[in-house]
C-alpha cells in the first residue's frame, strides 16, 4: 500500500495531519488495519519539531497497537533523494533476516516519542508487514507498506 499527502505549511516542518494522512492512505490501499503493521521505519526531517510531529502522527494512526519504531536514518544520515528507496531496502532486509535495527543515539524520549515502542537496541523479531515513512521538506509525505510474500 502507498499513501501520499502534502501539507506545505512550512518548508522544513511537516505537520501532524499530513504524515497521518499518508499513513492512513497506505493502510487503506493495502487493505490492512493498524494492528497488522509490526514495524515502522520512521523518517521525518531530523529536526526536533519535525520528528515530534512524526511521532505524534504515528501515535495518532497506530495508537495502542505499538508496532516497533526505529529510523535507519539514524545510522546512515540523510541520503537525500535516495533515502526512501534505501529505507525500503533496509526494512526488507530486516524483515527477511528477522531483526529490527535500533534507533541509535536515542537516549531521552520527548513526550511524543515516549508513547511509541522505539527500538533502542537490535531486536530479534520475525515480522511480515512494515511501513516506511518519508516526510520531507516542503510538506511532502509518503508512506509505503510492504508485506512479505508467502
Where do the model's predicted regions map?
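Conserved "HGTGT" condensation-loop signature of ketosynthase/thiolase-family condensing enzymes
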Residues: 1-150
Amino acid at each position: 500500500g502507498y499513501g501520499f499527502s502534502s501539507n506545505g505549511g512550512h518548508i522544513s516542518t511537516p505537520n501532524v495531519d499530513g504524515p497521518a494522512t499518508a499513513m492512513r492512505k497506505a493502510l487503506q490501499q493495502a487493505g490492512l488495519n493498524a494492528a497488522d503493521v509490526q514495524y515502522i521505519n520512521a523518517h521525518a526531517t531530523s529536526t526536533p519539531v519535525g520528528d515530534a510531529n512524526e511521532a505524534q502522527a504515528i501515535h495518532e494512526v497506530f495508537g495502542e497497537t505499538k508496532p516497533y519504531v526505529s529510523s535507519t536514518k539514524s545510522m546512515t544520515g540523510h541520503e537525500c533523494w535516495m533515502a526512501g528507496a534505501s529505507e525500503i531496502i533496509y526494512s526488507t532486509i530486516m524483515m527477511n533476516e528477522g531483526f529490527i535495527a535500533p534507533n541509535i543515539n536515542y537516549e531521552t524520549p520527548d513526550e511524543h516519542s515516549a508513547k511509541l515502542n522505539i527500538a533502542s537496541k537490535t531486536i530479534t523479531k520475525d515480522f511480515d508487514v512494515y511501513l516506511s515513512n518519508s516526510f520531507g521538506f516542503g510538506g511532502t509525505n509518503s508512506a509505503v507498506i510492504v508485506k512479505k510474500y508467502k
